[in-house]
Each structure stands twice: as structure tokens, then as C-alpha cells.
Amino acid sequence: MSDHNTKVALLILDGLGYGKDDNSNAVKAAQTPFLDQLLATYPHAKLNASGEAVGLPEGQMGNSEVGHMNLGAGRVVFQELGRINKAARELVFEQDPTIQSAFQYAQANHKKVHFMGLLSDGGVHAHINHLMALCDAAKTAGLTSEQVFIHAFLDGRDTDPNGGISYVNALNEHLQQSTGTIASAIGRYYAMDRDNRWERVQEAYNLLTQGIGIPSEDLLASIKESYSQGVTDEFVKPIVMVDAKGKPKATIQEGDVVICFNFRTDRGREITIALTQQEFPEYQMKPLSLHYVTMTAYDETFKNVQVIFQKENLTQTLGQTLAEHNKTQVRIAETEKYPHVTFFFSGGREEEFEGERRILIPSPKVATYDLQPEMSAHGITDAICKDMVAHQPDFICLNFANPDMVGHTGVFNAVVQAVQTVDGCTQKVVETGLENGYSFIILADHGNSEYMINPDGSINTAHTTNLVPCILIDKRFSHIKDGKLGDVAPTVLQLLGLPKPEEMTGDALAY
């Protein structure tokens, strides 16, 4: 069945799932003549992109990191969330050598311990249960609430935009029988930037190291005050907890222990760089000498950062398999999703494979993407159309970020525009590709834009557990089976006429 001249393009419409036919669905509200035509003309299927099908706990929504990892690996990749949940449940933190040596260092040197990360049960970047387990481990190790401090990054993106209060309440309740004192809070917009907006990171750095923020003796009251001004969790300005004399309860000082409990790597990197790796004189940020620990390996090049859970290396991913068969490949995305089509799609590998090229189109510099819902989709489209004609790479992995990134803003009309932009851009890419001998697999990595409004009328900014579409354009195959994201790489190899490595346990879906 193989035709060795076949070339395959995988188009990932990020965050575009199957939703209900109602007014919560921005995909349905959008004019998508091209996608409608594809669904009417070509074989298509539904893929599972959440929960155990992608290596997450049952019922856990998918996300881009997990999605691209499964897409590229061709198997179910068991995710950090599942591993760390198990460790937290089984009290592994109380014996973990990295955590215990950090606690022992703090005790021996009379230093503070700071737990820092996203206060949320979204399970995308972090989980409040992991923080609670760390607090319990600190208590078991003999540390007190005068030694252990928590710097909470508020979510509102993978969770309800006004959910921060309930997480602070849950944490406070837990701390009554555990160890730890909340020292500060700030929206993830500042503390968890991933787009080199160092002026945002600076707000978090100044809060953490100097206690610069809105002074507060009552965190819940301060967050409620923020809500009353229309500022939701994600964007909450720095809040510093102070004592009766107005002095910050704790800031990160030279020699302290910092444990960053976010397990997803991409949004933990910049604050870690500022605190430990690199000076930014123009933002008055310089690294401190810290005993710094991260839940997972944020970056292999970081110096003097200890890691609790090392990455399990994935071999024989799609990228590696293509390279071993001397195939050329292109990975293309805008800044927001560039790590996903490169690092995550390659199973956690930073460097290119032999025959791989990468095209990065900068994301627009706007405060939030509802202000520019087309993002950089047109730039991606122009670049890949030129590349298909000029270089004819054997495989293309392309990501359109719009339905996800604009979906996270919760601005319904902007999401509609985002989806319409992607429909038009997909048309140009497919038409150019068909003229140049490409087959296509068009799918999403998880849902988001198809569910924008909750039953109570409130805005939903988070991902979903919905199934995602998978459209096959290849004249040799008239059918495609339902499956999971981990079945996509074997299907790409099937279209290319290449054997599937035994590490890829997913199934080829075309027939």
C-alpha cells in the first residue's frame, strides 16, 4: 500500500474539540466553510485527548504539553501528574532524598523553606494536593510554620477565574494541622510567563525577594478586593502578607531553600531563570544563591537546580523514527506553541533530529490574545506554504494556537474570530499541500474553544475533556477509526509506508 513519494502534514488545531450544539460552543458559532467541507468529504474520526487515554488521571482534561507528547510518541505517555499524585498519596515526599536534603540543609543552616507554585487543582501545571503533601513532609521533618512559607500563584486559567478564594480556604484549612504560612500571592500572568515578558516576571521577582506588593493581613479580603475591581485570579497584582507592624512575613533571601512545585516545565522556567540563572540588569533582577529545587526538570541546562522527579526519556518517537529512515521533517508554530511542536513532540528532547528543521513565527506582543485573535496564523500559513513548494519536506508538524490561546481569554466573539482565522489558514495550507503531493491529518490536541460558557452562564476559560476531531486526507484510504492521540504517529508512519517501532504501542487508524 505504501507510496514512497507520499509526504504527510499533521495540522494541529490547538484547543478545537467536539462540543455540544448550543450557545456555549464558539466553534459552532464560527463560520468554518472549509472544515465543514472536509468533514463532509473526507474520512474523519473522534480521538480521546484526555484522562487515561493520554496518561493522565481519569477525568483529567488534556493539555498541549501532554497532547503533543502523546502525538509524537505514538503511545500513551504516563504524565507527571499521575506519577506525583501517587507519590503524594503514598507519602513518598517524606522519604524523597532531594526534598529531605533540602529540609536538612534549612534546619542545619537556620534558613527558611519557601514553597512556590500554582495554587490550583487544575492539574495542568501543578496540584494543590502536591503542595499539601510538601507541607506535611515539612512537618514530619520537624519544620515549623515560622520556617516554612508559601508563595501562591493564582490560576483562573485552568480553573474558575474567581476560584482562588476556595483554594486559599482549602490551603488554610490544611495548614491548621500541617506546617506552613502563606507569605505572598500573585496572578500567574506575572509569575508564570513563558514569552520572555520579563517586565511581568519582575513583578513576581520583586514580590518574592523584596516583599514589594499590596500589603495585606487578610489574603482572602485582598483577593476579594481584586475581584471587586474586575481583576480575576490570573491577573491578581502582587500581594505581600505582613505582620501587625507592616513587615513582610517572609521574602526569599540568600541561602534559603526554594521548592517550586509546578510539575509542568514551560511556565516554571522564567521565574527560575531570574531567581537562579541569569542577571537582568535592565529589570533589576539578579540570581540569588539558593538551595533551589523543582518538581521536574524545567531545563537540562540549569545550573545548581535540584530535581525531584527526573523525566523518563522517550525513545523511538515519530521524529526519531523519521530521522532513522532519512526523512526530512519541519516543525512550525508561533512562540506560544513552539515548545510543543519541538521539545514535547520529540518526547522531551531539545535538539533537532537529523533532517529536521524548525520554523518559529513570533507571537504578537499583545496583553491578551482576544485583542488579536488571528495571532500569527497568517505568518505560519505563508511560511509553510512557501516551504512545501520550495523544500517538499517529507513530514510537517504544524500548530495553529488560536482556538486554545484565545479560548483561554474567555472572550466569546474573539474565540469565534480565532476559529474562523484557523479555518481560512487551514484551507490555504491544505490546498497548497494537495498541489505538492501531501496527505493530511488534521486534528486537535485537546478541547477548549468548543465549550466557553458554563451552565450557570459564567465564562469557561479552561480546557475540556471532550473528544477531538481527526480528519484524514489521503486518496489511498477511505476510512479512519476512532482512537486516541497516541495512535496518530503510527498512522503517520502508515501513510509514509514506514514500519512502526515496537516502542510505539499505538495503532494505525487508516484503512
What are the functions of these language-model segments?
Residues 1-511:
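Feature captures the catalytic ectodomains and active-site-proximal regions of enzymes
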